[in-house]
């Protein structure tokens, strides 16, 4: 499970940031990026890094008054600026002249933890990635914890924390392989416990995500782990497979299903497949795919019920158990409603007494019997049984609804 201090620290950071920045999120972002541009134009080293002016960068680095660790509005260094602008020559000059910047993270609340390598892999600049790694760029340790990259409602992106997950979301297979070869763990998890596969399931470009899933799973299989990567749960107990079902990502779900199937035989257009129902069937799994679909609020998740083998499994369960269970409940409910209706129809009434006070508009001819008059005859006792059944049935229905 996720550590409590980590969650408290995340919540406190968000609360502190919102108290310090009482403006709207979008307005605050606009102001921050305007300040970022202003800093670039005012700080000579930043400006030359943005303009890719190698000669000026070398002169500035040789100047004693130049602070190579100077930060901008985003907490960025000059190397971050060069990498964000995809300026290879400027970035190489900065790495050669100030190698201390290679693993320096951004320090602002928004971009906390972003290293130049994070930016290079997202921009898919393979040459920059190669230069950063060959000069000692750390691919395993850096973690992005800035609020801009947190998963939230209305968020623009969620790439996780680690460099590998950033590379996976970008979808460049050469960069993914390069990062893994440099020592990145395929099983690293972010503050939600999400691995790179979880994060890929949440990406909008499903085709690229599926290709990255295949590559990362293939590289992870080389390590001969006891548990396959696609069965590693996050801190909410969801594997990438279950997360795809919960989010209604049909493409990723079908892709992961197909990776688990076994072809029995093939004859022309006919193919017989065996499907692994682990994580799908609700038998012995309280958080199965079926449970997540039925209990979730995502409408698009219902579409997964049409995907093989979920459709066949639901049909089989309905024919074997569901329809009989439904018919039994329907019968019990009809009996309950019938009993309740009869109790209402034969409620204890008597003729209105002669001294019954009524207005000219009141046409009442029968009134409710007193309690002692209501339960005298055999018919009254039968009605009493029906009333007890009605009350108990109402409590049972209430308890069932509350439990669900």
Model-derived regions, located:
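Extended, low-complexity, polar regulatory segments
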Residues: 257-260, 264-319, 354-366
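Ankyrin repeat domain, specifically the short helix-to-loop turn at the C-terminus of the second helix
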Residues: 30, 59-66, 92-103, 130-148, ...
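Ankyrin-repeat boundary/"N-cap" motif
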Residues: 38-44, 71-77, 105-115, 142-163, ...
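Intrinsically disordered, low-complexity cytosolic terminal tails
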Residues: 1-45, 55, 147-150, 154
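Soluble extramembrane regions of membrane proteins in the secretory/endomembrane system
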Residues: 166, 189-191, 196-209, 217, ...
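Ankyrin repeat A-helix N-terminal signature
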Residues: 47-52, 81-87, 119-125, 166-172, ...
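Hydrophobic alpha-helical transmembrane segments corresponding to the first two to three helices
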Residues: 309-404
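Conserved ankyrin/ankyrin-like repeat signature
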Residues: 55-56, 89-90, 127-128, 174-175, ...
């Amino acid at each position: 499970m996720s550590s409590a201090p980590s969650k408290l620290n995340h919540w406190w950071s968000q609360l502190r940031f919102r108290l310090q920045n009482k403006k709207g999120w979008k307005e605050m972002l606009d102001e921050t990026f305007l300040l970022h541009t202003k800093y670039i134009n005012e700080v000579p080293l930043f400006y030359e890094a943005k303009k890719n002016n190698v000669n000026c960068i070398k002169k500035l680095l040789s100047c004693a008054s130049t602070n190579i660790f100077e930060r901008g509005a985003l907490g960025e260094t000059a190397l971050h600026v060069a990498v964000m602008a995809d300026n290879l020559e400027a970035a190489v000059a900065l790495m050669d002249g100030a190698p201390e910047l290679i693993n320096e993270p951004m320090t602002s609340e928004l971009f906390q933890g972003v290293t130049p390598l994070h930016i290079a892999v997202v921009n898919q600049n393979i040459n920059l990635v190669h230069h950063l790694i060959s000069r000692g760029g750390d691919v395993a340790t850096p973690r992005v914890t800035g609020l801009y990259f947190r998963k939230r409602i209305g968020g623009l992106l969620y790439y996780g924390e680690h460099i590998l997950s950033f590379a996976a979301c970008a979808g460049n297979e050469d960069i993914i392989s390069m990062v893994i070869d440099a020592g990145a763990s395929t099983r690293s998890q972010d503050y939600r416990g999400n691995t790179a596969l979880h994060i890929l399931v949440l990406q909008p470009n499903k085709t690229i995500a599926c290709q990255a899933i295949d590559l990362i799973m293939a590289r992870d299989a080389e390590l001969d782990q006891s548990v396959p990567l696609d069965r590693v749960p996050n801190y909410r107990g969801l594997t990438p497979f279950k997360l795809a079902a919960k989010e209604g990502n049909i493409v990723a779900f079908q892709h992961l299903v197909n990776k688990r199937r076994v072809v029995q035989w093939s004859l022309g257009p006919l193919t017989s497949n065996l499907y692994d129902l682990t994580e799908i069937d609700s038998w012995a799994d309280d958080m199965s795919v079926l449970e997540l679909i039925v209990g979730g609020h995502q409408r698009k998740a219902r579409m997964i019920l049409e995907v093989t083998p979920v459709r066949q499994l639901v049909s089989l369960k309905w024919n074997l158990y569901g329809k009989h269970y439904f018919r039994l409940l329907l019968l019990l409910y009809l009996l309950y409603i019938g009993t309740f209706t009869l109790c209402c129809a034969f409620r204890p009434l008597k003729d209105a007494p002669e001294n019954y006070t009524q207005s000219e508009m009141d046409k009442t001819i029968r009134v409710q019997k007193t309690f002692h008059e209501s339960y005298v005859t055999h018919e009254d006792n039968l009605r009493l049984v029906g009333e007890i059944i009605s009350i108990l049935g109402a409590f049972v229905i209430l308890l069932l609804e509350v439990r669900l």
